[in-house]
Amino acid sequence: MTTPKPMLLIPVENQVRELDPKLLLACVAGRRGFSSVIGSRREMEMRIDHFPRSIYLSKSMTVRSLLFFWVAAKFGHDIITWDEEALVHLPPEIYFSRRLNPAAIRYVTHLFAWGEENAELWRRYPHLPPAIPIHVTGNPRSDMLRPELHAYYADETEAIRREFGRFILVTTTFNHVNACGPDMNLFKP
């Protein structure tokens, strides 16, 4: 008899941006024998003591994560992490100071990188625990762009095409240079 795999806890903070990719992750995990719970990050963190020992997927390792990581570890949960902001990032020293906390990262058992460049960035972090494995896996947000998944959004895509015709979308909301308030821009002209 095999030991059952632990449950995977997949929190969602921004439903529009995160829910579909995390559903994809839960499906892939399910094929590999993992049960998953997907829910509001806030609610999941407030009720972490109600879950059996599980694997909690965090999207960051900032100082704000520290208290929750400590509590989750006290209840026997493993914490695995990717960084949602690591695909395109600030220079390493600034990235390290804003996105990684030396105390928080000590609670993390596995890191999942967007790609080799992300993994290399983490390897250069001076406070990286030496035994922490870094897995280059990509990210389900980018997986949603794969051709075999285009049908998932086919109805929405067709409705947009009917309404607007052919167009080019230029995204201009980059938080470092065009934040919602000018005082929040990291770089100023």
Stretches found by the model and what they are:
Residues 4-5, 165:
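Phosphate-coordination loops involved in phosphoryl transfer and adenosine-cofactor binding
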Residues 6-159, 170-178:
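Active-site and donor-binding regions of nucleotide-sugar-utilizing enzymes
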Residues 163-169, 180-181:
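Charged active-site motifs of nucleotide-sugar-dependent glycosyltransferases
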Residues 181-189:
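A solvent-exposed, charged loop/short amphipathic helix patch at secondary-structure junctions
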